[in-house]
């Protein structure tokens, strides 16, 4: 097997990353979920102040996986990081690529004074076992936190009532 290299994503990786976002959405049984294109990823990640951090895993210079994360802030502990996505193509799963990608995110978080790394995993997703191997806590069962969301339409309605 070729050497697996983890590196910062480049603008030219955005087409592959967008394709992987769709593959991840398909796996998560939400094929209509992703609404962005690779141009949005390019703009938001590489123009002006980047809105996200992204690493890619490569084999023979071909992108085979990625992570996408960003900084958050916790009133309990300060600077934090959120892991939005981690994805490895099926041919490279169970070859420690996910571990290398996750470790790169953890290193970035620690080097930038983050006190925690948050993420969500679907209830049925076997990836939970992967995260538990590295001592991730399931906050839903441990602390009874539930995740909520306002979708764009509801967010607009809520904002329209703002004085």
Task: Annotate the PLM regions.
Residues 99, 111, 123-143:
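Conserved active-site alpha-helix within GNAT-family acetyltransferase domains
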Residues 86-93:
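A short, internal acetyl-CoA/4′-phosphopantetheine-binding micro-motif in the GNAT/acyltransferase core
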Residues 43-56:
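A short helix-loop-beta-strand connector motif used in the catalytic cores of GNAT acetyltransferases and
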Residues 100-116:
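Conserved acyl-CoA
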Residues 18-44:
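Conserved GNAT-fold acetyl-CoA-binding loop/helix
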Residues 5-17:
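A short beta-loop-alpha structural element at the N-terminal edge
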Residues 56, 62-70:
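Conserved beta-strand in the GNAT
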Residues 57, 94-102:
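Glycine-rich acyl-CoA binding loop
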